A protein has these predicted regions:
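Extracytoplasmic
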Residues: 9-13, 219-221, 365-575
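Aromatic-rich transmembrane-lumenal/periplasmic boundary elements in polytopic membrane proteins
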Residues: 11-51, 194-241, 401-425, 430
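Membrane-interface coil-to-helix junctions
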Residues: 12-88, 112, 116-124, 129-135
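Membrane-embedded helix bundles of polyisoprenyl
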Residues: 18, 85-98, 103-186, 191-209, ...
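Periplasmic/ER-lumenal interhelical loops and adjacent helix-loop junctions
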Residues: 46-47, 195, 203-279, 464, ...
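Membrane-helix boundary/interfacial segments in multi-pass membrane proteins
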Residues: 47, 120-132, 254-259, 289-341, ...
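Signature aromatic-anchored transmembrane alpha helix within multi-pass, membrane-resident enzymes
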Residues: 101, 182, 199, 343-372, ...
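Hydrophobic, aromatic-rich transmembrane alpha-helices
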Residues: 193, 245, 261-296, 347, ...
């Protein structure tokens, strides 16, 4: 039985490996929003107390701490692969819990749906690796909450704390975890527990938002730029229902840019519809099915004219609601229900031998109708190597950290040594001990989306105007980095550079020293201390939950003579 129980996790591992295989090569993940560097540091930006909204906390803090021990490139690639594996394995375990009659065939279908879908492909191409880590935790959260229904000991809550903390690498991940946990809960005690743990996991960005320089209202242009998008032959609703509809048309696999997208969508929705009918008749997973429907319909409505108007009002009038503008990311909430429904579809075939055949056909159809998810989404996601000069410049700045301005000032870059023709976030802010001043302005599908960095925008204007060094120093800038071979509007910034001492220069990058005295722009020590304390609450939740998970798993294996089907720290009851 133990060998049979290993089939779903090994199958999920194979699928995750098929997707992330190119990242096994030496180098760093660098694609659009995904940036990994050899080292990261606990800067104001990493803590979420800079000018920008705390969108990447506690992720950046965690990476900064862990890169003391592990190279950042290795760490991020491992976490991404782990997130996909957890999605598939967790979906299989959730299916085994809710529809045990589906057996191994059903678990394999569930794992396939969780990993092999347009949501994963499009978020990979957008570089949302940490969102995918949270996505991978969703079925585990649902499974753990379901098993809490009959738990009597406090230790049974430890796995839930662990999974919500892992999902909470990003603010969006915490919200996803909270919604899935509440949907899976059936009693008040479980709902209160899910809410309490989610609040603790959210402490880093809640405290950072409360104590930051400001929680900026969103830019109205961003609502249209980040709205869910219709894919060929599907419309917006069909795209979202098939787990696609990414706002960025460039971050879409080739198979979703033609009418071939309709083929995968039909296959997926037939499998899910058959299984959903089985679940409905059995009164199973109704909460998960409910949020799946909402996760498809609500973003579709928000992408309409009235929906865009409502979203614009919300994010411009209510600070902190910018998290709502990317409507398609909430489709992740549909994955647990889709996976369980896929498993339940197997039950419609009564003969066990026929169930294996049906499951095999379903898995093959899903994979072959989205063929370019394999091998790094058709080879577009690869590991890159930084030029040697970048490390030298980082070493100079880290030896004497002062805020840094970067030329060209655009937020996104295109490097000849980077992923071919794919824009990427500037990696430099995550590589140095000092904060980088930047406006954060973006241009998305012809829309100019204003960022949060007021000081950064002022510094960019000074550089474009060829301002004197003392004006940069008055804004706290101690270094200027000029990156070669990446497009951008530098205007007459060369006038400013000509007045600065060159600390380093090669064909790829140059570093200039701005003479002091510099106006300090760091966050007050008290604010940093409070936000660090909030991050430590999240770390404690993660560590305590993780230790309890390992201890309970060890106890279960010892108690069963080491022959029990592998699980991750669950309460003794499977009801």
């Amino acid at each position: 039985m133990r060998r049979i129980g290993l089939i779903p996790p090994l199958y999920a591992l194979a699928l995750a490996a098929a997707v992330t295989a190119p990242l096994a090569a030496p180098g760093y993940l660098l694609i659009r929003d995904a940036v990994s560097t050899p080292r990261s540091y606990v800067t104001d930006a990493a803590l979420g107390v800079g000018e920008a909204a705390p969108r990447a906390v506690p992720q950046d803090f965690f990476i900064a701490v862990m890169t003391v021990l592990v190279d950042g490139g290795v760490l991020v690639k491992m976490l991404l692969a782990l997130g996909l594996w957890l999605a598939g394995w967790g979906a299989a375990r959730l299916a085994a819990q809710l529809v045990p009659a589906a057996g191994i065939p059903g678990e394999l279908v569930a794992a396939t749906i969780a990993i092999w879908n347009p949501y994963v492909a499009e978020r990979l191409l957008q570089g949302h690796w940490s969102l995918l880590v949270g996505y991978g935790c969703l079925p585990w959260i649902a499974l753990t909450v379901i098993r809490l229904r009959t738990a009597t000991n406090l230790g049974a809550w430890c796995p839930l704390a662990f999974w919500i903390a892992v999902a909470g690498l990003t603010p969006t991940g915490t919200v996803l975890a909270l919604i899935v946990g509440l949907a899976a809960a059936t009693d008040r005690r479980s709902r209160v527990g899910v809410l309490a743990i989610s609040v603790l996991a959210a402490m880093p960005w809640l405290v950072a938002s409360g104590l930051g320089a400001a929680v900026p209202a969103g830019d109205a242009a961003g609502v249209h730029a980040f709205a869910a998008r219709a894919e060929p032959g599907l419309g917006t609703l069909g795209s979202l229902a098939s787990l696609g509809g990414m706002w960025n048309a460039s971050a879409v696999p080739a198979s979703r840019t033609t009418l071939f997208a309709l083929v995968f969508s039909v296959v997926l929705l037939i499998v899910v519809a058959v299984g959903a009918a089985v679940l409905w008749r059995a009164r199973k997973a109704l909460g998960l099915l409910g949020i799946a429907v909402a996760a498809v319909i609500i973003p579709a409505l928000l992408a309409t004219g009235p929906g865009l108007t409502l979203t614009t009002w919300l994010i411009t009038e209510v600070p902190g609601l910018g998290i709502l503008r990317d409507g398609q990311k909430w489709v992740a909430l549909a994955m647990p229900a889709y996976a369980v429904a896929g498993a339940a579809a197997v039950i419609a075939v009564r003969e066990r031998s026929s169930q294996y055949l049906a499951a095999g056909l379903a898995c093959a159809a899903l994979i072959f109708t989205l063929p370019d998810l394999a091998w790094g989404v058709g080879g577009r996601m690869t590991a890159v190597k930084y030029p040697s000069g970048w490390n030298a410049v980082a070493a100079h700045i880290n030896a004497d950290p002062h805020p840094v301005a970067v030329l060209p000032p655009e937020t996104m870059r295109q490097y000849p040594w980077g992923p071919s023709s794919i824009p990427v976030l500037d990696p430099f802010p995550r590589w140095i001990r000092a904060d980088t001043v930047s406006s954060g302005d973006l241009r998305v599908d012809g829309h100019d989306v204003r960022g949060d960095g007021t000081r950064g925008r002022q510094v960019e204007e000074l550089l474009r105007a060829g301002a004197a060094p003392r004006e940069l120093a008055a804004h706290g800038v101690g270094w200027v980095v000029a990156q070669a071979d990446t497009p951008g509007q530098q205007a007459v910034s060369s006038k400013t550079l000509a007045q600065l001492d060159t600390a380093y220069r090669d064909g790829d990058i140059a570093l200039y020293r701005v003479p002091g005295p510099w106006n300090p722009i760091a966050a007050p020590p008290g604010r940093r201390a409070a936000v660090i304390a909030a991050h430590l609450v999240w770390i404690a939740l993660l560590a305590a939950g993780g230790v309890a998970v390992l201890r309970r798993q060890h106890t279960r294996q010892v108690g069963s003579g080491g022959t029990q089907d592998p699980k991750i720290c669950t309460p003794d009851s499977d009801n």
